[in-house]
């Protein structure tokens, strides 16, 4: 909740790191250090206590979803792609590295100039800047489930994500492809974090599109071409459904 920087300040102020391995390591470091400019000083302490016993590399669902979608888009030979709310430091970066022009649809301009990345200022629930049947490649990876819950400062609106889904398929051209991911399980809202959907609910919402592939990420792994109903009542972790649709 606090974030790493703020938690570190909290840990230092309240001595959370004291009587832990950090204190022992400080003593050892100080006894061995021969460079005065690199001596430990109280004002520069930045104690991190979680990393020592953390797994060196955990492949999260976000890693797999970003890789899954990017590989498919690159393989399709797409030159220009549109996106709603996906991770810039993962999925979008993959596409940019492959030389694909990416148009991010957002109500706010992107704060930094990045080669190949353009912001289209638009409300994703309306997509008023786009003609019907005009988009050939579009994605929304783990973003639509957050719409209308107020978590990111957006207006509270229970229908917001469903309006966006309706507009996406309306704006897609014949032969166009949609890459979408959402949490999978029993239909529900876990306010104000996100919504969870049956896989079949997503398929029924995008009734103007054909499902090409449904895969899932689960606890650091990916399962390709999963059964639609396999995770309807799954409660052993967070499952992300990966949907590829074509119009």
Where are these regions (language model features)?
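N-terminal accessory regions of S-adenosyl-L-methionine
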Residues: 1-80, 94, 190-208, 212-222, ...
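Class I SAM-dependent methyltransferase SAM/SAH-binding core
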Residues: 75, 80-127
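A short acidic, Gly/Pro-enriched loop at the edge of an enzyme's catalytic core
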Residues: 127-138
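A conserved beta-strand element that flanks and buttresses the S-adenosyl-L-methionine
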Residues: 139, 144, 148
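Conserved class I S-adenosyl-L-methionine
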Residues: 150-152, 177-203
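Short glycine-enriched, charge-decorated loop/helix-capping segments at active-site entrances
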Residues: 152-157, 229-231
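A short glycine-rich, Lys/Arg-flanked "PGG" loop and its adjoining helix->strand segment in the class I
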Residues: 155-177
